[in-house]
Amino acid sequence: MATINYKIIKDFFSKEELNVLQKYCYNRIDFNKDYQVDPQSFSPAWYNDPLMIALLDTKLPVVEKNSNLKLFPTYAYWRYYVFGAYLKQHTDRSSCEISVTVCIKKYDNWPLIIEKQIIELKEGEALLYEGYDQKHGRPGIYKGNGMAQLFLHYVNQNGPYKKHAYDQISKNK
């Protein structure tokens, strides 16, 4: 994948799948306060949420096709960016060798920056990138009304980080 740099996957979710996912996320926000505050963005985050773990496996063939790699899932979570969120440029840990971030719902634009490239995802679109190697983040402080983002992480089955397969899933069930 090192030669791909990053790739936008259009229609990662069908309209029906996206609708279900949006409703699910907003129900979690409204009725379940079991989130963690993400230390990077200061926003609510749900790590290894059961639906997101199901998506980690369900979307594996799509991610493998687009990365041209055989992958092991590592973990998944989703975050709801709130007014005042901040996400500085960073790289992720080795369990995020291959990462996918999906725009679930947004009311305002707050682009991704990956290796100095500005990327705007539409709802349902995904960005495939090397989270462990590529610096990524978002510019400035979020001044919008909310944005839900899904993160699916994988490692190359033949790579140096394969020991991280399913690394946090069993710990957080």
Regions found by a protein language model. Name each.
Residues 68-77:
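A short coil-to-beta-strand element that immediately follows conserved catalytic motifs
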Residues 1-67:
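Non-heme Fe(II)/2-oxoglutarate
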Residues 80:
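Conserved active-site beta-strand element of glycosyltransferases/polysaccharide synthases
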Residues 17, 70-71, 108:
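Secondary-structure boundary/capping signal
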Residues 11, 140, 154:
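Active-site donor-binding loop signature of nucleotide-sugar glycosyltransferases
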Residues 8-9, 72-73, 128-129, 151:
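A structural signal for short, well-ordered beta-strand segments and their strand-loop junctions
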Residues 58-62, 77, 99:
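Generic beta-strand or strand-like secondary-structure segments
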Residues 83-138, 145-150, 156-170:
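Catalytic core of non-heme Fe(II) oxygenases with the double-stranded beta-helix
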